[in-house]
Regions:
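Proline/glycine-rich low-complexity loops and linkers
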Residues: 1-25
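Gly/Ser/Thr-rich loops at beta-strand to alpha-helix junctions
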Residues: 10-13, 41-43, 122-128
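Short glycine-/aliphatic-rich beta-strand segments at the starts of folded cytosolic domains
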Residues: 25-43
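Short beta-strand-to-loop capping motifs
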Residues: 36-39, 72-78
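Short amphipathic alpha-helix segments
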Residues: 38-60
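A short linear hydrophobic-aromatic micro-motif
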Residues: 56-62, 190-194
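Short Gly/Ser/Thr- and Asp/Glu-enriched loop/turn motifs at secondary-structure junctions
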Residues: 65-69
Length: 266
């Protein structure tokens, strides 16, 4: 049978010891794997349970979610291919095969590709930038971060066309695109991230509800813009937007398809 155990949110040393103990108790000789994924765990729970059932108690998966990031701790008997099934099932969701944050993985890929990053944030208000510069050595690959919160800052600092904001609004595909384009045109960067949206609790409408977010990620070759409506309070919407933006940048740097249709995040 499969056993479900709630682990602590940071998988601290006591939790690792507990995890190892459970592995010996339940499985005897076993392997431990960590998989980092992007997406709500509710969307994945049934498929994870199916993987556990397929191995008749030879594999156990412990999930923990923070925002849109899910950490899977996989225990399985030595030689059991359960973790391979996890990779196959959630390939588009996985961003790391070790316990590493989105921002850290993003910087690692910038280093490997020898690329520089610039960020323009509206609703996220510096959350992406702050998270990135928590990492030592970020200055080697992180060039610039702007909080362009007002319409005038978007037009003055990023060269967003005032007519675009007038016709489509600050929260739109078009504005997000121009924000990223402004970074690429004016900044010293190879890849750009831009966010604009309605964090709430006020400011929403029928056509543009609270939680509506546009995220642009691009290079000099192409800019992709993604639309999402994130649920939750103001902080949760901002966190989800920040995490999604970094995940998209990771996918772009890894040359993965940016078709997001198969990944549910809200």
């Amino acid at each position: 049978r499969a056993y479900k155990v709630a682990l602590s949110d940071d998988f601290s040393q006591p939790s690792r010891q507990l995890f190892g103990f459970l592995g010996k108790l339940l499985l005897g000789e076993h392997e431990q794997h960590t998989v980092k994924m992007f997406g709500y765990i509710e969307d994945m729970a049934a498929r994870l349970s199916a993987i556990e059932r397929a191995y008749g108690g030879r594999a156990v998966v412990f999930p923990y979610r923070e925002g849109l990031v899910t950490t899977l701790k996989v225990l399985c008997e030595k030689g059991c291919p359960a973790v391979s099934d996890v990779f196959s099932e959630f390939n588009k969701n996985i961003y790391a095969e070790e316990d590493v944050r989105l921002d850290t993985r993003l910087l690692e890929l910038l280093s490997v590709r020898n690329k520089t990053l610039c960020v323009a944030e509206s609703l996220t208000g510096g959350m992406i930038c702050s998270t990135i510069i928590d990492n030592p050595g970020a200055s080697k690959y992180y060039d610039e971060g702007l909080i362009t919160y007002s319409n005038s800052s978007k037009t003055d600092r990023l060269n967003v066309d005032p007519e675009v904001i007038k016709n489509y609004g600050a929260v739109s595909y078009q504005t997000a695109y121009e924000m990223a384009a402004g970074l690429i045109m004016k900044g010293n960067c190879d890849i750009a991230i831009a966010t604009t949206g309605i964090a709430g609790p006020d400011g929403g409408s029928l056509s543009k509800p609270v939680g509506l977010t546009f995220i642009a990620v691009g290079t000099g070759e192409k800019i992709h813009v993604f639309r999402h409506v994130f649920k939750g309070d103001r902080q949760q919407v901002r966190l989800a937007s920040s995490q999604a933006a970094m995940f998209y940048a990771i996918k772009r740097l890894k040359d993965f398809s940016l078709d997001y249709a198969e990944i549910r995040i809200n």
